[in-house]
């Protein structure tokens, strides 16, 4: 009898654990907020966390202050949408149409924008720690005072983007086009920028200590007052590069 009771208890707890770990969790979003978005195209300060909004046309949507944590917006049309102060932690926005969008002061930690059109998007003061912008069109985008620490921007087009005072420490910018980009007083400590195009870029006062710029294009770039402690420029093209009063302590040029 005693053995049978123990066996039954073990079976019960085993079944309970199985249910706990295999049952699919319910969607976290608020149904009324989702309905509002679907009917009006906007949902400011709503809870849309975990919602799948992929391939929808949400052009110009107002999503100010909304919670979109873990939501999926793959190939979604969002040109001109407003995400100011919204939370998009671990949100997937790959291959989306996001031109002219606003992400001012938004939380974008671990957000995946890979392959998206983000021309003229505004990320002023957004927090985008470890966000992914690989292969994105970021022409004329604004990243003023944006936290992009450990973010990935490999092979993205950042033509004339404004990254003034942005934190790009430990960021990945392999093969990134930063032609005529503004990186004044940006933090690029230990950034990986091999093969990047920084021609005509303004890096005045930028911190590039321990950054990798091997085989990068720095033709006509401005680096006055930049901090270049142990920066690796091996193989870089530097025709008419203006170092001005840059701090070149132990910089590596060959």
What are these regions (language model features)?
Residues 23-25:
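N-terminal signal peptide c-region/cleavage motif recognized by signal peptidases
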Residues 18-20:
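Extracellular polysaccharide-degrading/modifying enzymes targeting complex plant/algal/animal polysaccharides
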Residues 9-16:
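Sec-dependent signal peptide recognition
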Residues 1-7:
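Short, Lys/Arg-enriched N-terminal segments with co-localized hydrophobic residues
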Residues 29-254:
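Tandem repeat scaffolds
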Residues 8, 28-29:
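Absolute protein N-terminus
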